[in-house]
Amino acid sequence: MSTAAFKRQSVPLSKLFQSYGKNNSQSKYGGYFLATLIGSGILATSYFNNNKNGNTPSNNHKKLLAGSGIVNTAAIPKGKSIKDYQSLYNEIAEKVRDQDDADDGAGRYGLLTRLAWHTSGTYKKEDNTGGSYGGTMIYKPESTDGENSGLNHGRDFLQEFKDKYSWLSHGDLWTLGGVVAVQECGGPKIKWRPGRQDISDKTRVPENGRLPDASKDADYVKGVFGRMGFNERETVCLIGAHCLGKCHKENTNYDGPWGPSFNMFTNDFFVRLLQNWHVKKWDGKKQYEDDETNSFMMLPTDMALKEDSSFLKYVKMYADDEKLFFSDFAKNFSTLLELGVTFPDSIKPTEFKTLDEQDK
């Protein structure tokens, strides 16, 4: 049986119960990545000069191009080509595969996806600060932001590649790690471009407060994603990545997975969200658990998608059509990872082959 086939299996409930309340190093490698999402954003101008790649952003993003202050221009390290990044992809994917059973079966998929989200999600369109370009999460106050709690494990997981390849930037490493995570657990192909540069100027480290509060309502969610230029459909789509990983109380004061298949990229988040939920009685933050098994969780910002009519129609749409969800997510996630980065025409988007594809 291939690794991909193995991953497309649900984790038994007995294994889920074993993971709750554990206080060990593996249980901290969590999947609470979209609960504390995004700042705001603007697309790089050159993104629109490459519409032939089929990864065209929304009209909302086009409106955000004017008026940005800082220009973050990507540049591939001298002597490097996309082949070097495919090799790097493979090395990261092999390590992810080797730790497939970590965190009681969640693996590193949610952790690395959350890291890619949060390094990109500090972006602010008004002044073109934050985002994945500078790799600033290694500096305070971003590194100690409460919304980034637990992501030190993700950075540590990838650090060996930064140590091995001096030419590799943190921004490229962390965003590529997110691409690996999505693709290697059965998700869609994510177009990606290299060339982000590390920033040593600590005055450019974004302040805390750009990553949102998971306890809020639908209007709050719209405001957070609207600051990036995402509309309601794109917002719902991106939050659908909650199919991966789980929350850990020691990191976020939320606990548990969103469903039983937390090491597989599917539309299960939307299917489950449409089921019946109730407020969990416990000593942590307010969260919801499913009526059927009391085993899975939803955050208040998740439930907001169900309670707001402008969101709900897209929840139903993606619950009914996983293929459409995959297609939309591929575009939106790629957009997120590139917020604030200006790519010259010479740096084209690429799709990496998964390990299973290369084994054929």
Swiss-Prot record:
Binds 1 heme b (iron(II)-protoporphyrin IX) group per subunit. The keyword Plastid does not apply. The keyword Heme applies. Its main location: mitochondrion. Keywords: Heme, Iron, Metal-binding, Mitochondrion, Oxidoreductase, Peroxidase, Transit peptide. InterPro entries: Ccp1-like, Haem_peroxidase, Haem_peroxidase_sf, Peroxidase_I. Its cofactor is heme b. One of its GO terms (molecular function) is cytochrome-c peroxidase activity. The record marks 114 as: Transition state stabilizer. Heme b binds at residue 242. Its EC number is 1.11.1.5. One of its GO terms (cellular component) is mitochondrial matrix. It is found in: Mitochondrion matrix; Mitochondrion intermembrane space. It catalyses: 2 Fe(II)-[cytochrome c] + H2O2 + 2 H(+) = 2 Fe(III)-[cytochrome c] + 2 H2O. It is an enzyme of class 1 (oxidoreductase). The active site is at 118 (proton acceptor), 258 (tryptophan radical intermediate). One of its GO terms (biological process) is cellular response to oxidative stress. Forms a one-to-one complex with cytochrome c. Belongs to the peroxidase family. Cytochrome c peroxidase subfamily. Destroys radicals which are normally produced within the cells and which are toxic to biological systems. This is Cytochrome c peroxidase, mitochondrial. It comes from Debaryomyces hansenii (strain ATCC 36239 / CBS 767 / BCRC 21394 / JCM 1990 / NBRC 0083 / IGC 2968).
